[in-house]
């Protein structure tokens, strides 16, 4: 469902489905919700709506921020947090589960381990489908809140030098963020990873097609001093087909305060989609470098804006 530049009734499958104007509209609405939430806890634009949260994979921040966003807007939520909790465990197909949810709810927020699951669901459902992460490449709403965070921190997304660090092969948040940057005009993108975890060919193809300046490197120290934004990701253990491969790359990078003080610009800001394991040392948390908790907080106003725009409700 839903196409064109307008938001009403639109599916959210890939960040590449959106242009700059659509994203700027989203960010302006998110700014309004950010201000309104400081004044009052509830803005009942979606009173009477039901939002289905269909999480076939575990999630903390994404699921809870969508649930909070829906409830702050006055909507009710239904859903589940794993396949084991529903009839999929008894052999029900994804298609039948989507049809059931579509008959109950006004929107479906879907997370699934298989790539293409959100697009498949959108083809079946009459109501809008929002991809909350599927497979290894797409996590569009995470990319939206990541861009929004950069915009709030720097006043712009253009003209900055970005480093994306860690699991660029299996990490869908990293892939989506890299793809999202191609909608803007970054000065430079450094893709920092071990050889086993280099960015996927289809992501590299988009970078090339859109004329992005980027470079693949293994050493963080080599480029850290140039960066305005460092986007750190954990190594995605659960997505490795071979655990021996995981053991080769686990702990490849660790961002410490000492490393930052030696190499980073004072203006550098660090993002992380969370959860983290040990890739950012806890002593970084209390420094101006750390923007990842603010980034997580931005999930609620951005997802409120998303739900309201798709419902066609004005702030």
UniProtKB/Swiss-Prot annotation:
The protein's matches in InterPro entries, at most eight in alphabetical order, are given as: Asp/Orn_carbamoyltranf_P-bd (IPR006132), Asp/Orn_carbamoylTrfase (IPR006130), Asp/Orn_carbamoylTrfase_sf (IPR036901), Asp_carbamoyltransf (IPR002082), Asp_carbamoyltransf_Asp/Orn-bd (IPR006131)
Keywords in alphabetical order: Pyrimidine biosynthesis, Transferase
Q: What is its EC number?
A: 2.1.3.2
Q: Where does carbamoyl phosphate bind?
A: 61-62, 111, 139, 142, 274-275
Superkingdom classification of source: Archaea
UniProt entry tagged with the keyword Lyase: no
Which reaction is recorded as catalysed by this protein? carbamoyl phosphate + L-aspartate = N-carbamoyl-L-aspartate + phosphate + H(+)
Enumerate the Gene3D superfamilies for this protein: Aspartate/ornithine carbamoyltransferase
* Listed GO biological process terms: 'de novo' pyrimidine nucleobase biosynthetic process; 'de novo' UMP biosynthetic process; amino acid metabolic process
- Where on this chain does L-aspartate bind? 90, 172, 234
Which pathway does this polypeptide act in? Pyrimidine metabolism; UMP biosynthesis via de novo pathway; (S)-dihydroorotate from bicarbonate: step 2/3
Q: List the disulfide bonds.
A: none
Which Gene Ontology molecular-function terms are recorded? amino acid binding; aspartate carbamoyltransferase activity
List the PANTHER family. ASPARTATE CARBAMOYLTRANSFERASE (PTHR45753:SF6), ORNITHINE CARBAMOYLTRANSFERASE, MITOCHONDRIAL (PTHR45753)
**Protein role:** Catalyzes the condensation of carbamoyl phosphate and aspartate to form carbamoyl aspartate and inorganic phosphate, the committed step in the de novo pyrimidine nucleotide biosynthesis pathway.
Please give the family membership noted in the entry: Belongs to the aspartate/ornithine carbamoyltransferase superfamily. ATCase family.
The record's note on quaternary structure and interaction partners says: Heterooligomer of catalytic and regulatory chains.
Protein's name in the database: Aspartate carbamoyltransferase catalytic subunit
Species of origin reads Hyperthermus butylicus (strain DSM 5456 / JCM 9403 / PLM1-5)
